Design a protein with these regions (language model features):
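Final/C-terminal transmembrane alpha-helix of multipass membrane proteins
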Residues: 226-248
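Membrane-embedded alpha-helical bundles of polytopic integral membrane proteins
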Residues: 2-225, 236
Length: 248
């Protein structure tokens, strides 16, 4: 059991952005969110695009197709129309094998190349679309989500630096985020009803670990910059779905 906790904590805490970079990014997104949903959507799209271009180990030419698909899909969220975004996402998904076939030079199988391109644009695109649409409906829910992620990752980094707390860092970081969620609901900083605390607490407690492990095991093989947004990757779309289905 002790070895399992140590291995899980090591994998869980492996995908971390620098505290300074994450603080600046979170502040920038919250500032854009305070201006409006459109500004937020453009900002998060440009931010993820810039980070991926700066940190990718693939040439700009080779990185062009997945980043183009990402931008087209991500910016569809600006229209605040889930059906439109779904159609754009499906079209991009269907076109991915064709793009992989055109760019395949025999160094990898078509299936591997297709999955490589998909992992580079679909998860960050889905994150951007979902948060942009949610921002158009209720910006406070997006602000709460960004704050929860920030303090979760902050707690994770602080615990990971202490040998005594390192193996328990996933539990302590998630507990801190859930406590912050409870506090936000108690002082009515969010439209989430008090009776929905436990479903959203479960979302935070289980969504972040799943998101971080999924990112490390699958996404970062192609899109290295995914390490910077590991906690957001799957949690963002799930948070949006829960907010739209249960709150708004």
């Amino acid at each position: 059991m002790r070895n399992f906790l140590h291995s899980f904590a090591a994998l869980y805490a492996k995908t971390q952005a620098s505290l300074t970079l994450q603080s600046l990014a979170t502040f920038g997104l919250l500032l854009a969110l305070s201006i409006g949903a459109l500004t937020f959507g453009v900002t998060i799209s440009c931010l993820l695009l810039a980070v991926s271009v700066m940190r990718t180990d693939v040439s700009i030419l080779g990185n062009g197709p997945p980043m183009t698909l990402f931008l087209v899909f991500a910016l569809s969220g600006l229209f605040n129309d889930p059906q439109l975004s779904l159609m754009v996402g499906v079209a991009a998904f269907i076109s991915t094998p064709a793009i992989a076939a055109v760019g395949n030079r025999g160094t990898a199988s078509l299936g591997a190349q297709t999955m490589s391109i998909l992992s580079a644009w679909l998860p960050p695109g889905l994150l951007t679309v979902s948060l942009t649409i949610l921002a158009s409906r209720d910006r406070s829910l997006v602000a709460l989500f960004l704050t929860l992620i920030y303090f979760h990752d902050l707690g994770l980094q602080l615990c990971a630096r202490s040998p005594g707390f390192k193996r328990f860092s996933p539990i302590l970081a998630s507990t801190g985020a859930i406590t912050l969620l409870w506090t936000a609901l108690q002082i009515s900083l969010s439209p989430i009803p008090h009776e929905w605390f436990w479903p959203f607490a479960a979302l935070v407690g289980f969504g972040m670990p799943i998101s971080r492990i999924f990112t490390e095991l699958i996404v970062v093989q192609r899109w290295k910059a995914a390490r910077l947004i590991a906690s957001y990757m799957l949690t963002g779309p799930i948070w949006t779905a829960a907010a739209l289905g249960l709150v708004l």
